[in-house]
Structure formats: C-alpha cells, structure tokens
Amino acid sequence: MSPLCAQGHYGGFIGEKYENLSQYAAMVTQKRAKGADFIKIMISGLMDFDRFGVLTEDGLPPETIRELIHIAHEEGFAVMAHANGARTVEAAALAGVDSVEHGAYLDTDALHAMRENGTVWVPTLSTIGNLRGTGRFDEAAVAAILESAMENVAAFAAMGGLIAPGTDAGAWAVPHGSLSEYALLEQVLGENAENILSRGAAEIQRKF
C-alpha cells in the first residue's frame, strides 16, 4: 500500500495524494476496504544532505498531523509517519502516532514526547551513513547529519525509548538485504544493542 501525502508536499512521487482532510478520510476508508494493515503518512520533507540542519520543507501543521493520525486510528489502523524535524515529530508523538520513520534533527522535547507516548522510532541511520564516500553530497554535511542522528539515538535509548531497526530499503545507497543499519545501530547502542532493538521490534510487531 502506498503512503498518503498532502497535495503539493513531499511524497507525491511515491504516495497517493489528498487535497484535504475529507479526501484523506475517504482514502483511509478505501484502504480498509482493500484490506490494508496500516497507514503510512508523509508529514515532512527530508534532509538536505548538502546542508546540515536543513529540511527540504517544513512539516505539516500540528493540528493537521493530529487529525491525520486520529482519522486513521478511528478506522482501526496503526499509523507510521515519515517525519523529520523536532516539532513535527513531537506533534506526531503527542497525537499518538505508532512509529516515526527517520526523525532527523530532534531535540529533548521531541525525544521525551516519543518516549512518554510509546512511539517506536525507526531512525534509518543507513540512509545517511551509506552516503559517506559516495561523492554525491557534501561529505562534511553528511557526517554532521549522521553524528546528530546517532547522538539522538543514544539519548533516546538512555531514556528507555523504543527503537527498532529499519533500513528504508530502496532509497539511494540502501540496497535490499543490506546489514548496514544494524552495524550503525550497534555502533551507537553498544553491548545493549540486541536487547534494545529486540524490544523495539517486538513493539512494532505488536502495534502493526
């Protein structure tokens, strides 16, 4: 099933586009009729890998994020969100999103919101780490983005947050079957990596 994205915002190249919440709600209902297992929403841009700290676009308004998640939950779906940026991720967590994919440039408030609301974070470090040395993007920017993400993963783990492995396979430099995500997460989480990731993966399985 394709992710759902707002018309004119990031995700249109891969997802199904809606123009307003009424149309989104109708699409969610259609997903239920077609036997979908969950809903994925696109609520922010992605990282500009040439400029540290920059996203290709801001996230959707918090009230919109809240409604998107509420509508899907009312239909009985778990919701995963492509989300970057502290305020966007915080809004999604406070609205009860089940998992956050990517989650670049988070701060303490966003991390606490995810932990307190039981959000599983799938940080997809390999989408950043695998860009190193390819020459496609600014190497200093890529290194800084990865360092920031790894620091946040370590902080979230220290809080007792739920972290699950996920590669975003099919993204540039992230081939199917790659184990680079595990290597990066193990680098961050150390000897506790297996226990932390098993706990997060079990929660993903329970939710989805």
Language model: regions and residue ranges:
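Active-site environment of divalent metal-dependent phosphoester hydrolases
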Residues: 5-6, 45-50, 84-90, 105-108, ...
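Short, electropositive alpha-helical surface patch
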Residues: 57-62, 66, 92-105, 173-188
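Glycine-enriched alpha-helix->loop->beta-strand junction motifs that scaffold or abut catalytic
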Residues: 94-99, 115-121, 160-162, 189
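Divalent-metal coordination cores built from histidine and acidic residues
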Residues: 1-53, 57-71, 119-124
